[in-house]
């Protein structure tokens, strides 16, 4: 499989407490199968952050990769938007 055909997701970093690992929550909208109402779904993914550049609250792009651990199957591609510190 070519690298550009791998699944890429955009989400928000909710945890950066682990070394070289971030937790990213990806939010999607889907229609309810019976009622047709738009419903928000969210799913958490663990991603590899080699240089520990992503911080909590950042918007990041992650890409599917080979399994790096029991729960880590994504890696950080880029930080799309840094978190605003108030």
UniProtKB/Swiss-Prot annotation:
Presence of keyword Nucleotidyltransferase: no
Keywords: Ribonucleoprotein, Ribosomal protein, RNA-binding, rRNA-binding
Entry keyword annotation includes Nucleotide-binding: no
Molecular functions per Gene Ontology: rRNA binding; structural constituent of ribosome
Domain of life: Bacteria
GO CC annotation terms, alphabetical: cytosolic small ribosomal subunit
A Pfam family hit: Ribosomal_S17
Residues annotated as signal peptide: none
Single Gene Ontology BP annotation: translation
Oligomer and partners: Part of the 30S ribosomal subunit.
Role summary: One of the primary rRNA binding proteins, it binds specifically to the 5'-end of 16S ribosomal RNA.
Family: Belongs to the universal ribosomal protein uS17 family.
Stated name of the protein: Small ribosomal subunit protein uS17
Taxonomic source organism: Streptococcus thermophilus (strain ATCC BAA-250 / LMG 18311)
Designated gene of the protein: rpsQ
